[in-house]
C-alpha cells in the first residue's frame, strides 16, 4: 500500500463550451512592448475542426487561424490561396507506453524493451505516418529543451539485434503482442506493428480504441485499479515548459504519482526526480534532468518514437509566431491587407468622402484595426 494513496490527474469527461469566446485587448497591461497588437480575438467553438479548416483554406474573413492541423491536411493548406502553413518544433512527444505490470509476457525485462525500440524504423514513422512533420527522439526530451543530453542518439533501426535480444529472453509461443492506440494514432500503430512483426517474428494485434471508449480506457490507466490488457499504448503528450521536461513528461509516465505510469513504481527514477524537484540551482537542475532522461533511455522504459511538430493554418495577412509550448496571440498582428483592416479603411474612406461632399458635421469615423483572429 502506498504511504500517500491520494493523487490527482486531469481527465476531461465532458465539455460545455460557449459558441464563441471573445478576448478583448487590455490596453492597460504593463508589458506594452509585447502587446497586444490585436483589438480582439474570437475563438469559434461552434465549428468542428474539419469545418474550421475548410473555412480557413477556402475563404477570406471567416477563419484566420486553425490550430492542430493534421499532417494529412498539410498539403491542402499549402495549396490554399488564402492561408499559409506555419510549422513549429513543439514540446510534444509521441511514444508507446509499455505495460510493465507482471503478466505472461516479459516486458519487465529491459532487454525486451530494448528489442521493441530497435525493431522500429522511426524515420519511416515520421515520413509516412506524419508526412515528415516530426523530429526524432532519443528518449523523452527534445534536443531544444533543457535537460537534453548531447551525447545521446535515438535507438537505431536494427532488426537483427532486436531479434537476438528477444530470443535471449524468450517470448511465449502463440502469444501476440497487443498494441493499442486511439483512433488518431491508428495508422502509427499499424506502422509500428509491421516493423515489430518483421523484426521480432511474433504475431501482433492492433487494437484501435474508438472515441466513445477512450474515456474508460484513460480512467483505467490513471486510476491504476485494473491492469490494462494492452502491451503497448501509442500515446501523445506535451510540455508547457522547455526548462525541465521531467517535471511534466517523465513524471507523468514513470513517477510515483504519474497519471500514465503503467507498471510498478521505479525507485531509481523517484530518487532522481526528488533530487531534481529540490534543486534551486538552475545548472544543477538541468544536470539532474539530463540524468533522468538518460535513465529512461538506458532502461528503455517506453517505445520512443518522435516529437511531432505543431501545424497551423494561418491567413496570409496574419503575422503569427508559434510558441513551442502553448497557443499564444500576444505578439500576433495583421497587416494592412487583412480583411478586418481593409474593411475598416474602406469604410473610413467612404465616410470621409460623404462628409466632405455633404453639409458639414463631425469628422469622426472608424479607424484603426479590428484585428479579428482565430
Task: Please identify what each model-predicted range represents.
Residues 1-42, 48-50, 159-160, 164, ...:
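Gly/Pro-rich hinge or "lid" segments in bacterial periplasmic/extracellular proteins
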Residues 16-20, 25, 89, 94, ...:
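Detector for C-terminal structural segments
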Residues 28-76:
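Ligand-site clamp/hinge motif
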Residues 29-32, 102-112:
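Short helix-loop capping/hinge motifs at secondary-structure junctions, enriched
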Residues 50-64, 76-80, 110-111, 190-201, ...:
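Short helices/loops that flank or line small-molecule/ion binding pockets
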Amino acid at each position: 500500500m502506498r504511504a500517500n494513496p491520494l493523487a490527482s490527474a486531469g481527465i476531461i469527461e465532458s465539455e460545455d463550451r460557449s459558441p464563441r469566446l471573445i478576448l478583448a485587448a487590455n490596453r492597460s497591461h504593463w508589458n506594452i512592448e509585447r502587446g497586444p497588437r490585436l483589438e480582439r480575438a474570437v475563438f469559434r467553438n461552434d465549428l468542428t475542426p474539419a469545418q474550421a479548416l475548410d473555412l480557413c483554406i477556402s475563404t477570406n474573413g471567416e477563419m484566420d487561424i486553425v490550430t492542430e492541423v493534421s499532417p494529412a491536411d498539410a498539403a491542402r493548406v499549402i495549396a490554399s490561396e488564402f492561408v499559409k502553413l506555419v510549422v513549429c518544433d513543439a514540446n510534444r512527444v509521441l511514444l508507446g507506453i509499455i505495460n510493465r505490470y507482471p503478466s505472461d509476457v516479459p516486458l519487465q525485462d529491459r532487454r525486451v524493451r530494448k528489442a521493441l525500440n530497435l525493431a522500429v524504423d522511426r524515420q519511416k514513422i515520421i515520413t509516412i505516418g506524419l508526412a515528415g512533420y516530426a523530429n526524432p527522439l532519443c528518449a523523452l526530451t527534445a534536443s531544444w529543451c533543457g535537460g537534453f543530453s548531447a551525447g545521446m542518439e535515438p535507438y537505431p533501426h536494427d532488426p537483427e539485434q532486436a531479434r537476438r535480444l528477444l530470443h535471449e529472453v524468450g517470448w511465449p509461443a502463440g502469444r501476440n503482442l497487443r498494441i493499442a492506440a486511439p483512433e488518431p494514432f491508428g495508422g502509427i500503430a499499424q506502422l509500428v506493428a509491421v516493423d515489430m512483426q518483421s523484426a521480432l517474428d511474433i504475431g501482433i494485434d492492433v487494437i484501435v480504441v474508438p472515441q466513445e471508449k477512450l474515456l474508460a480506457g484513460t480512467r483505467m490507466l490513471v486510476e491504476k485499479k485494473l491492469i490494462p490488457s494492452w502491451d503497448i499504448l501509442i500515446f501523445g503528450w506535451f510540455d508547457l515548459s522547455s526548462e525541465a521536461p521531467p517535471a511534466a513528461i517523465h513524471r507523468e509516465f514513470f513517477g510515483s504519482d504519474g497519471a500514465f505510469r503503467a507498471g510498478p513504481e521505479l525507485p531509481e527514477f523517484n530518487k532522481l526526480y526528488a533530487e531534481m524537484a529540490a534543486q534551486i540551482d538552475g545548472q544543477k537542475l538541468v544536470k539532474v534532468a539530463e540524468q533522468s532522461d538518460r535513465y529512461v533511455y538506458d532502461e528503455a522504459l517506453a517505445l520512443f518514437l518522435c516529437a511531432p511538430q505543431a501545424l497551423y493554418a494561418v491567413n496570409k495577412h496574419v503575422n503569427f509566431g508559434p510558441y513551442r509550448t502553448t497557443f499564444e496571440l500576444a505578439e500576433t498582428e495583421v497587416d494592412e491587407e487583412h480583411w478586418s483592416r481593409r474593411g475598416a479603411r474602406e469604410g473610413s474612406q467612404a465616410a470621409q468622402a460623404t462628409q466632405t461632399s455633404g453639409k458639414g458635421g463631425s469628422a469622426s469615423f472608424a479607424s484603426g484595426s479590428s484585428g479579428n483572429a482565430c
